[in-house]
Every structure is written in structure tokens, then in C-alpha cells.
Amino acid sequence: LKHFPLITAHTGCMNTPENTLLSVETALRSEADIIEVDIRVTRDGVAVLAHDEILRLPDGASLSISQSSFEELEGVDLPDGPGHAGTHRLVRLESILPAVKAAGKMLNLDLKADEAIEAAGELTARYGMAGRVLFTGCGAERARKARGRCPFVRRLLNADAGLFRTAGPAEAARIACDDALSAGCSGINIDYRLAGSGLLKAAARQGLPVYVWTVDDPRKMRHYAELGVRGVTTRNVEALVCLKKEWESAPS
């Protein structure tokens, strides 16, 4: 029986607002192995949890994260996003690290800008979490920059979706593996819809585990677990945890 994949709780898991303390706290209370958050950096170098560069405010105004200081942003009420009626404040990456470390979880930092590499790496080192952090959101170029600036943090190559749609699966898999190896990546992170058995086999030959995102359908979770992926990112953490318990209780 294959090992069950690592469970990554996507930010906003279990119907919480994305990139909020509530989302992180909910993920920490779950049986997920890895907590995912999106990372951007303010003008003064503060790593924050945010997907988009432009913050849309309830009154229709907008603010640029990279062009604003953290002090300018920290008091702003931000909409919780689609499906949520509340607001939240911008969260510093540093503020969640002690709880993640204490919980013994891993952290998937989805880097949304090159500037996030050093800010996130410095905090990872300061909190002694190099063994618990993965950098994702890295195409080949960003992965190479991350290796140069923060070689102590493991990276996953974000496979180029466009390549898989244009080059054909075998050639795209070969290029993804070559890019991952040349950038010193620990594995490949890919949209589950592009992760076929050909990629898994090609990556396995190179010693590269494959992680898939974002799988919320329990039937698809089972399919990718059986295919042999190393990790599955999901918003539906409870369903993946249930499948894991069923998987591990099955006779070998």
C-alpha cells in the first residue's frame, strides 16, 4: 500500500476567509500536515498574508501592498472575500510562525512576488523553521532566485501550465523535471488537472515527488492518492482526512 499523501490545508480552507488568522487557526486545529498561505511584501519589507497585490477596500478604494508601508496597511479593514460578509486586518507572516511551530506543522509559503523570497527566508531562519517551510509559487526563474537567496529553504517548482497545454504531456513533463532539477527543487507542484501518470513516472525517475493542487472532490482525492502523489492541497480538509483514515485502516 502506498503512503498516503501529505495533506495541505489551502488558505481559506473549511469555508474560512483566505489569508486570515481564522483560516490559519482553523487549519492548525485540523489534521492537515501542511498549512498554506500566500505571501507578499510591503514597501518596507514586511512579509504579509495576501494573494493579490491590490487590496480592494469596502468603500471601493484600493491600496497597493508593494507601494505601501505595513503601518499604512495594518489598520485597514479588508473585505473577507466572496461568500463572506465580514472584514479582517492584514496579517504579518511573523505573527503566525510561533503557532505553526508549536503545532508541529509544516508551512507552504506560496510566494506571489520575487521580493517575498528574502523576507520569508529571513523569518524562516530567525524562527528556526527551515525544516518546516516549503516555498511554492516558484516558476523556474523564481525557484533559481530562491535557491540563490535562501538555499536553506526547500522549494517546489510550480509547473508551467501553459507548457502542458501546448507542448504535449511527455515533453512538458521532461521540461518540468529538467527545470526542477536545474533550480535545485525538492519536487514539483502542479494543478491536479495536469498531473497524469506520465508526469508521475518521469518525476519518479528523477527522484522528484509531485504535489497537486487544489483537489476538493473526494473521488479525485482518492484517484491522486492511488496515483502516488506526495501531497494534495485542498480546501476540503475534513474529506481528505477521512480518506486518509479509511486508507490507513484498510488491510495491507
Where are these regions (language model features)?
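Phosphate-group recognition and catalysis centered on beta-loop-alpha active-site segments
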Residues: L1-S252
